[in-house]
UniProtKB/Swiss-Prot annotation:
It comes from the Bacteria. The gene is hslV. InterPro entries: ATP-dep_Prtase_HsIV_su, Ntn_hydrolases_N, Proteasome_sua/b, Proteasome_suB-type. It is an enzyme of class 3 (hydrolase). Disulfide bonds: none annotated. This is ATP-dependent protease subunit HslV.
Length: 181
């Protein structure tokens, strides 16, 4: 799978709050095609947050499949994620999808990849954090620093971390979208 350009999706958990944020930039090769895309959404009647990096059409297909898995497994996020990853890895058509997902509920934050990975990041002092996309390393570093050395709420940690990622990563802009639990 080739690296994805054109997005940063960040998920932060602190004090019982979960915030998922994304930038709005869509890049095709070396051209910015759109600056206000929504890459995060609510699933399972608002109980789950999901964000994507990669091909948009592929991500929407994966959102649909993931929502079905959530229904099949009584909204168990880890179980639904593992079942989607198994299907994604073994189905010939799904294997060609080029996207990554971050999914979260109040207890779990997971990253799903087309390689069949389901990763739950280690907790960090003050909460939990994960990001995908080209600006992920910058957003994670900033969020971890803020979680460990400030009392900012989850939403503000996500906002400041995404602003920093937008300043550094040329494939990430500052038109931010947030979803919260």
């Amino acid at each position: 799978m080739r690296p994805f350009h054109g997005t940063t999706v960040l998920c932060v958990r602190r004090d019982g709050k979960v915030v998922m944020a994304s930038d709005g930039q869509v890049t095709l090769d070396k051209t910015v095609m759109k600056s206000t895309a929504r890459k995060v959404r609510r699933l399972a009647e608002g109980a789950v947050l999901a964000g994507f990096a990669g091909a948009t059409a592929d991500a929407f297909q994966l959102f649909e499949l993931f929502e079905k898995k959530l229904k099949e497994h009584a909204r168990s996020l880890p179980r639904a994620a593992v079942e989607l990853a198994k299907q994604w890895r073994t189905d010939r058509m799904l294997r060609r999808l080029e996207a990554m997902l971050v999914v979260a509920d109040r207890e779990h934050i997971l990253v799903l990849s087309g390689a069949g990975d389901v990763i739950e990041p280690d907790p960090v002092p003050g909460g939990g954090v994960v990001a995908i996309g080209s600006g992920a390393p910058y957003a994670v570093a900033a969020a971890r620093a803020l979680l460990g050395h400030s009392a900012l709420p989850a939403r503000q940690v996500a906002e400041e971390a995404m602003k920093l990622a937008a300043e550094i990563c040329i494939y990430t802009n500052a038109n931010l979208t947030f979803e919260e639990l």
